[in-house]
Amino acid sequence: LRAAGSPVKTTNTESTGPIPFMKMIDTALFAVSRKGKKAGAAAAYMENWHLNFSQFLDLRQNSGDPYLRTRFLDTAVFISDEFMKRVQGGQDWYLFDPAEVSDLNELYGEAFSRRYQEYIKLAEAGKINRFEVVPARQQFRQILSSLQATGHPWLTWKDAINLRALNNNTGTIHLSNLCTEITLPEDENNIATCNLVSMNLSAFLNADKTWDWDRLAVSVRSATRQLDNLIDITNTPVAEAMHSNEQNRALGLGYMGLSDVLEKLEISYESEAAYDLVDQLTEFISYHAIDESANLAAERGSYPNFAGSGWSKGLLPIDTVDKLTTERGVKVKIDSKSRLDWEALRQKVKKGMRNATLMAIAPTANISHVAGTTPGLDPQFSQIFSRSTLNGKFLEVNANLVRKLKQLNLWESLKDDLLANQGDIQGFEQIPQAVRDVYKTSFQLSPYAFIEVAARAQKWVDQAISRNMYLESRDIDEYIEIYSEAWRRGLKTTYYLHVKPRHQSEQTTVTSQSVQKVRTDSAKRVSGFGFARRKQS
């Protein structure tokens, strides 16, 4: 949408810009309450060269004009490589009215940078009427300050998404979805749809800590076929969505339970062994999903938009990393090693693919609990949870931790203190350091570990990854470096930023006659729920 104040020639008036329309959508989401159980949900994406971007940043703020705020509509920013390079180089950033630079929205990579720089010259020559100039680093600080304060906007990278897409022959990808793992093109005739499934990694880890690779391969291939069947039997009420589903047959296989299996294997989340395991598992799942889609194409035919796609040229997700490096002009810091025979698969996919996309790693925040494992790629947020069900509220302790402490004969002696300390084991010297390293929680891990895990997986994933970030720091300059590293490592998207609370509730123990404080080291604690432990009188 054109910027606020942009002239509307047909009516001799001025546009109100995109913000009021976003408010309308926000109100509609509130109206769709699903019997009061859950409000509707949607996400608005904006490129940060839009003249009204500063107002977009304020949408989720608590203060200010309520008519210019959204309470249900999530927000995300679509960032170009041109902007990131200007942040790194300390250069200015120009904001334009889309009415005067109408083609920018459809461009990406080198084509975007070239055209954007041409518009800068036109603006400086007085040939563009409405524009603003801000230091690129200043705008990046504003984005990250808003992210810290409100959790929005999520950061996504337009060029990594489009340049690495194998299905971009049908148009530019302009946005992701509510969880930032789906990257599909759409237009007025096509509403993008994707059919998702998440594999529970824990189900393929044997009791002797070896992997059942054969069973995992069979499950991936079965899931690919089941999702493809689902496309044909699903009743899609919106014609544009049905058309997109039929023309692209997009799938999104992902997985959950990473932290769960790392604990069972006694591997620290921030170790090279963990990064290599993510690399190996994601490559394996990607290989068998792509191969099975090629098999389906031979049986049932390719998806209608196959011709002209990256698949039709024999390209695979790993092949697009070099393309991103070339267009960006900056090497993408991704290790391109592989373990499987991808060359044979390159020749196979040229002949046909049943599905435009195969992989997307979702957050699985809810279904992972049903499956009894950890969500997506995320580490453990806490070792103790308060879980609410229809039968009431109860505590749940990480079963892997309990099992390990019992093996060390420490559970009975430490369980009360662990409950009082919200499950944080880092301050307990009785527990070996190697065990404490394995059971670090979200805010105790390096943020660069989150980036490394996502980067290792992203090189094999043709769509994107829902990557939550957890930070204890409130230093925006540190945020700039962390998110710049995510860009350098080739991440396509990030999701919520969780910042450790400044304050935590005081913990107490209860006796029959008195209440006394529990000594805790706040520097070694993690956020979570408050608990009390009962002493025997």
Predicted region positions:
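Inter-helical turn/loop segments and adjacent helix faces that build the functional surface
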Residues: V32-A44, S63-T70, Y94, A125-V133, ...
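Internal maturation/activation junctions in enzymes
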Residues: K37, S219-M242, E246, S268-T364, ...
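Phosphate/diphosphate-binding loops
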Residues: T70, D74, F78-M84, G89, ...
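Function-dense linear segments that define catalytic or interfacial modules
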Residues: L1-T10, E14, P18-F21, A31-K35, ...
